[in-house]
């Protein structure tokens, strides 16, 4: 098992996840997202710890609060935003939304 320590990189990633999640809540509250959105605000570090134990050969099946897992595992957030906006360049072609990544 890999040793996990709190460092600048972990804190920076947790803040990135928090900011993306807050942006989703803001978009949802103004009616700019279809369906619903389930954030992982307050659970950012669990996503980072979880993904830190995986290899690129692993398959990930998450729950309905999966944005943090996605961001940490893929190391990107742009296609996640496009997905929740219903755009074809989203991670699931814009049809998966928040719950089906």
Predicted regions and their residues:
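Cofactor-/ligand-binding subdomain signature composed of acidic, glycine-rich
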Residues: 1-34, 56
